[in-house]
Amino acid sequence: MAIIEAENLTVSYYGDIDILKDVSFEAEEGRITTIIGPNGAGKSTLLKTLYGLLIPKTGTIRFRGKSITGLKVHRFIHTGIAYVPQLRSIFPDLTVRENLELGTWIFKKDRKRVDRAIDEVCERFPILGEKRKTRAGLLSGGQQKILEIGRSLLTRPSVCLLDEPTATLAPRIAEQIYRTMVDLKSEKITVVMVDQRVRQAFDVSDHLYILELGRNKASGTRHEFEGSLKEMIKGWLT
């Protein structure tokens, strides 16, 4: 059953050239769905639209069957949808702990709930507990990405939207991120990601969507794409 879905989305920046053209998408609950395609295909634009950062010119977005098209961004955290952008979103002059606390504003002043949520994230990512008093700007790139993902999980979302979560990371750290996605799936959390490490993302995904030039090119399960993915990627590079 689809937990988040979009139908016939057309999206542009500043009302000019359409970046997404009649794109449809759905992600099943408790599954990993990956959006792949060549540069400029509209992958990140789709994630931003699903999270309400961009308003579609046409089309509908639904979460658990209810329309969330045009919902204000600050309300998305209350719906159970989290988003980690491609560009770094940490506050470098704040400590790891302070960065995490910023992700708990929904709990208001319930200190016990805040502490419990942060402890759970630090248990999932021990490095965050070890570095909790360290300024975030002093962390490695991989540790900063772990901090961003950890912060997104503080509210126990139903859906995590991850834009290029392994970009520029060392293979060892990227593998840790992929393992985290599999762990989230085991906890019935839906993961929707954009990723350029196609082979590795393919291996952990249940379903894939391929975008080209802002349009749906193909979609299917990992097994349905076995054998054809290599040729498809080769076509993007020529």
Labelled PLM ranges:
Residues I36-P38:
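The feature captures the beta-strand-to-loop junction immediately N-terminal to the Walker
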Residues R135-L139:
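Conserved ABC ATPase signature
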Residues S152-L153:
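ABC ATPase C-loop
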